[in-house]
């Protein structure tokens, strides 16, 4: 599968997923292609992987991997809980536990 068709398929997978699984508070929202964007993408031999997100308020993040040998895609859906900074001077290099 070429990269362009893989990107289109991934965006459609996310649109279908969101529209079937959206929160009750988002029932009036319909996701469209312009709400989906690619964060990162890579093609190696017959395999593809892409990380995508959306402009939707749900905070979901998607990872889609295409297995070119089996002609199937695996979809992982993530929710970002928090983003915080740890400065290098605060790194703890001791193994705990």
Q: Can you name each region flagged by the protein language model?
A:
Residues 1-22:
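N-terminal trafficking/processing presequences and adjacent post-cleavage segments
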Residues 14, 25-26, 48, 89:
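Amphipathic alpha-helical interaction segments
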Residues 4, 16, 35, 82, ...:
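Short non-domain terminal segments
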Residues 57-97:
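Intrinsically disordered, low-complexity regulatory segments enriched in Ser/Thr/Pro
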Residues 15, 26-33, 40:
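Transition segment at domain starts
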Residues 34-72:
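Amphipathic, interaction-prone secondary-structure segments
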